[in-house]
Amino acid sequence: MMESIKKLRELTGAGMMDVKKALSDAGNDEDKAVALLRERGIVKAAKKADREAKEGIVRFVVEGNRAAIVEVNSETDFVARNSDFQALVEKLAQTALSAKTNDVEEFRNFSMDGETVGTVVAAAAGKIGENLVLNRVAYIEGDKVAGYVHSNGKIGVLVDVAGGDETKAKDVALHVAAERPQYLSRDEVNQDDIEKEREILTNKALNEGKPQQIVEKIVSGQIGKFYEEKVLPEQRYVKDNSMTVGQYLGDASVKRFVRFEIGA
């Protein structure tokens, strides 16, 4: 019980007594307890517990209509800023372009300098003196491909834009880095999650004393806002919030995007 209380306090930021009561009312079901806390207005949204931040950098390579991106973690920011480490990550990105994979385990076994990628990373770790982890890799091939790295390599993005030019592709990559979209369209959103969210928001509004006849309107507005925050074409465009990303793109469309962020 105490372990669950500690976990939910970290997860929601709620007080001990509120968490304890929610767990009791939920029959010690942690997910149900989080939903109860939200319905009671004690927390605004379920959020993940803070995790120890990983250091490292993200690098990408674009060649024509192909691109690859990698994330490599280090123990300290000092190593992340080390020129040897940065050169390694850049070479890994170039190698990923040849590997054409989105599977990090497959990439670790890919050939590089007569060794496997995993062996090369392990050797670099021994030389640098820190544990290095090849965390993620992605490869895209499409129409107009562009990339963007932000915040000293802490965030990296690749996008594939169909029907657009290089400027639009680069602008969308910058937007994705800044605004953290999660979906390309509403169709990608798990409808079970939406219904669960709708139920929580409905119960919360009713618990706040909102009249039944306006609760549905309130909840629909909040669900719409969820889509506006999470679905790329519906987000307000970062360079001009008078329009959405979809409006900025016009006849063009984003076919795929990849966003890596250190520690996320």
UniProtKB/Swiss-Prot annotation:
SUPFAM superfamilies reported in the protein's UniProt record: Elongation factor Ts (EF-Ts), dimerisation domain (SSF54713), UBA-like (SSF46934)
Pfam families recorded: EF_TS
Disulfide bonds: none
GO CC, one annotated term: cytoplasm
Region (Involved in Mg(2+) ion dislocation from EF-Tu): 76-79
Coiled-coil ranges (or none): none
Organism domain of life: Bacteria
GO molecular function: translation elongation factor activity
Gene3D superfamilies membership: 1.10.286.20, DNA helicase RuvA subunit, C-terminal domain, Elongation factor Ts, dimerisation domain
CDD domains: UBA_EF-Ts
Role noted for this protein: Associates with the EF-Tu.GDP complex and induces the exchange of GDP to GTP. It remains bound to the aminoacyl-tRNA.EF-Tu.GTP complex up to the GTP hydrolysis stage on the ribosome.
Family of this protein: Belongs to the EF-Ts family.
Protein name, as recorded: Elongation factor Ts
